[in-house]
């Protein structure tokens, strides 16, 4: 009974991307920076070892189970520096390596799609202007067709900061908050109760329709709760409206072969539900891990369980919350033995990421990095698998493991 579990630690990059200097960001003062030298795992470990991440936790980064699976060595091979505080003498029990991205961008959709065999080789559309970011004709059509009293924002912003700045005005006026970032996204924040969750979803569906001509990857519903700027909080009812992958992915291949694909968290949204046979909602690291365990307990033959642990990225990476990211990794690490205990000799466990989001880096955006490529199971020979030339090597390996047709991109670790 062959089953694969993919645990994707959203944004947990391992540095080393040779093209990182091509990814340029800009700060509020107009100064620019690039991603060269960014290393999510490496820098978290470094700052923990220096005592600079002691809020809510203490001391060196403690992730013995991830290290035993090869994360430390994968990071060292990717970036030439072994993560500080991790034991370099531990002999990994998994196949470990790192993969470079051939997609043109460093966003969520590009990373996930490339992992499943469909790299994004075209350019996404972006709303580049920091202020007055969206085309006026788009805004006018949204106001008219959705019968809105107007809108707020229309800028690049951090999702938490914009709630502090505009949340109270939104409550008073009923105007939705429109904002974007360096990613190919149109984000809409509305109060879950006063504006209404279903109304927000319908507004996002309309927006998805209207931004297609701009080649925008995702429209994201960002519902929040609270009564004042001091207590506004995003709820767990985020919903992403993605374009469909441009060609069939590993997930569709498994579904078409008669197998099952169980998505947990935002995976179903990222793939626009393509190739998904069961979508399980969960919010927060604990619930996501619990759901992963529960689905594995009941999964049958030829099943892929795919979980995105979004909190690493959304709660800690983008917010540049170093101690929070470290504490979340340590929590995840403590839960890993539960997953390993459920694995049978016919199962495959894959741990990876979709991009970086170094909490020590400038700005608030993703960082261009290699991702870890970790494979654990009876069918896997432990040891180094080196640099993988594309994220798609991960999907190709899973296809090979399940005896599915070869994907268009990637080389299997089993071949």
From Swiss-Prot:
Its cofactor is Mn(2+). Isomerase that catalyzes the conversion of deoxy-ribose 1-phosphate (dRib-1-P) and ribose 1-phosphate (Rib-1-P) to deoxy-ribose 5-phosphate (dRib-5-P) and ribose 5-phosphate (Rib-5-P), respectively. It comes from Psychromonas ingrahamii (strain DSM 17664 / CCUG 51855 / 37). It catalyses: 2-deoxy-alpha-D-ribose 1-phosphate = 2-deoxy-D-ribose 5-phosphate; alpha-D-ribose 1-phosphate = D-ribose 5-phosphate. One of its GO terms (molecular function) is magnesium ion binding. Keywords: Cytoplasm, Isomerase, Manganese, Metal-binding. Its EC number is 5.4.2.7. It comes from the Bacteria. This is Phosphopentomutase. Pfam families: Metalloenzyme (PF01676). Signal peptide: none annotated. GO terms for cellular component: cytosol. Belongs to the phosphopentomutase family. The lineage of its organism: Bacteria, Pseudomonadati, Pseudomonadota, Gammaproteobacteria, Alteromonadales.
């Amino acid at each position: 009974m062959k089953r694969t579990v993919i645990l994707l630690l959203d944004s947990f990059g391992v540095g080393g991307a040779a093209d990182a200097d091509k990814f340029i960001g800009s700060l509020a003062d107009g100064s620019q920076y690039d991603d060269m030298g960014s290393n999510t795992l490496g820098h978290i470990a470094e700052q923990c070892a220096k005592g600079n991440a002691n809020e809510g936790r203490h001391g060196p980064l403690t992730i013995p189970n991830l290290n035993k699976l090869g994360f430390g060595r994968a990071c060292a091979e990717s970036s030439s520096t072994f993560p500080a505080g991790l034991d370099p003498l531990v002999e990994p029990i998994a196949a470990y390596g790192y993969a470079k991205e051939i997609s043109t961008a460093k966003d969520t959709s590009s990373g996930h799609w490339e992992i499943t065999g469909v790299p994004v080789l075209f350019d996404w559309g972006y709303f580049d202007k920091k202020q007055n970011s969206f085309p006026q004709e788009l805004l006018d059509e949204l106001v008219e067709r959705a019968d809105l009293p107007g809108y707020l924002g229309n800028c690049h912003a951090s999702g938490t900061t914009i709630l502090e700045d505009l949340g109270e005005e939104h409550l008073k006026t009923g105007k939705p908050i429109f904002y974007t970032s360096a990613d190919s996204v149109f984000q809409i924040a509305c109060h879950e109760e006063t504006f209404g969750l279903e109304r927000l979803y319908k507004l996002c569906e309309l927006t998805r329709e209207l931004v297609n001509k701009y080649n925008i990857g995702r429209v994201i519903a960002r519902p929040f709760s609270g009564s004042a700027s001091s207590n506004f909080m995003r709820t767990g009812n985020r919903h992403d409206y993605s374009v469909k992958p441009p060609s069939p992915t590993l997930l569709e291949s498994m579904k078409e072969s008669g197998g099952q694909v169980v998505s947990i968290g935002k995976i179903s949204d990222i793939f626009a539900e393509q190739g998904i046979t069961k979508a399980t909602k969960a919010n927060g690291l604990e619930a996501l891990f619990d759901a992963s365990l529960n689905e594995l307990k009941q999964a049958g033959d030829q099943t892929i369980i795919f979980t995105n642990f979004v909190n690493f990225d959304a709660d800690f990476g983008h917010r540049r919350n170093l101690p929070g990211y470290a504490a979340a990794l340590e929590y995840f690490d403590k839960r890993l033995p539960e997953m390993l205990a459920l694995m049978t000799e016919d199962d495959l466990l894959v741990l990876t990421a979709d991009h970086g989001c170094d909490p020590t880096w400038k700005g608030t955006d993703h960082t261009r990095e290699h991702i870890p490529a970790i494979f654990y199971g009876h069918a896997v020979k432990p040891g180094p698998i080196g640099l993988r030339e594309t994220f798609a090597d991960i999907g190709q390996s899973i296809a090979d493991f399940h005896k599915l047709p070869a994907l268009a991109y990637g080389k299997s670790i089993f071949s």
